[in-house]
Amino acid sequence: MADKQRAIFQDVESQAKPAAAPGGIDRAGKGARGAIRAWIMVIFAMVALMIAVGGMTRLTDSGLSITEWKPVTGSVPPLSEEAWMAEFEKYRQIPEYQLQNKGMSLEEFKGIYWWEWGHRQLGRVIGLVWALGFFGFLAARKIPTGWTGRLLFLGGLGGLQGAIGWWMVSSGLGGEMLDVASYRLATHLGLAFIILGFAAWYIFLLGRREADLMQARRSGDTRLFGRSTGLMHLAFIQILLGALVAGIDAGRAFPTWPLMGDSFLPPDPFTITPLWRNFFEDAGLVQFVHRMVAYALFLYGAVIWWGARRGPNGHTRFAFNAMFAVMLLQVILGIMTAIKSKHSFSSCAMNVFCLSICSIFSQNQNV
C-alpha cells in the first residue's frame, strides 16, 4: 500500500507545469508598427500643411479660380498661353469675377490660380501617399492585427474630404455668391481637423505595445481624461466657428478689441429672419460668439492646466504645459487677427494637436 501511494506522489511530482496560454494581445500579429507609424506621421504633416495652404487660399480669395473638378486630369496645370486663356475665360463666367474682380488681368489670375491648384495638388499627393502605404503594407502582410480597418477608415475620410471640397467650391460658382458658402467651408475645415485628430491618435497608439496600452487604460486618471477630452471638443467647436467667421469675412466687420466697435455687443445683431440664421450669417454676431467661446475655452483650459500642473507623471505635466502655452499663443494671435485682419490656421493645428496629446497622456499615466 505504501509503495502504491509513493508511486502516485512520484507521478504527480514528475508532471511538468503546463505553460500559460498566450493572451489575445500576445498572439496578435505585431506587423510593422514603427514603419506604419512613420508613414502616418508623414500624412499628419501633409494634412497640417494642407490646412495652412487652405487658409492662404481663402485669404487670397483663390478658392474659386478653378471652376471644374477633375481629380486626375486636373493635376496638370495650364502649360501654354492658350490653356491659360481658356482657364481664365471659365473664371470670367462666375459671379466672383463679374461682381468683384472685373478687369482682373491674366497675370493676376495666375496668382490666385496657383494657390488653388497647389491646394488641390497637395490633396492628390496625400491620397497617393496613403494609397501607396496602405496597399504596400497590406500586400506585405505587415499591418498589425486590428489595424486594417483603422487605416482604411483614415483613407476613406481623405476621399470624403476631396468630395466635400468640391461641394464647397461649387456653392460659389452660381447665383450671386462671391465666396463659398460658410456652412460648407466649416464642414470642409472641420473634417480636415477630424482627419488630423485620428492621425495623431493612431501615431500615439502605434508608439506603444498593445499590452502597455491595456495596462495604461486600467491605471489612467479618468477624471483628467474626461476634462481634457471636453477641452478638445470645445476647441473643435471654436475652429468651426472660426470657419464661419472666415466664410462671411466677419473678422473685418469689427477690427477692434476688446470691444465690438464702441460697445461690448455688436449693434443690431438680430436683423435676419428667421432668428437662428443670425448666429451663422450676421457678421457681428458670428464674430461675437467666436470671441465668447474663445474666452470660455481659455478659462476652461487654464482651470484644467492648474489642476494637472502638479501631477505625479512628468509626461502628463509636460503635455498640459505645452497645451497651455499654445493656448496663450492662440489668444495673442486671435487678438492680432481682430486688429490686423490676419489669420493663423497653423496655430489652430498646433492647438488641437496639443489637446490630443493631453487627452492621451491624461488617460495613459504610464506613458
Where are these regions (language model features)?
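Membrane-interfacial, low-structure loops and terminal tails that flank and connect transmembrane helices
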Residues: 3-32, 208-225
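N-terminal signal-anchor transmembrane alpha helix
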Residues: 36-76, 234-246
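Individual transmembrane alpha-helix segments
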Residues: 90-128, 278-297
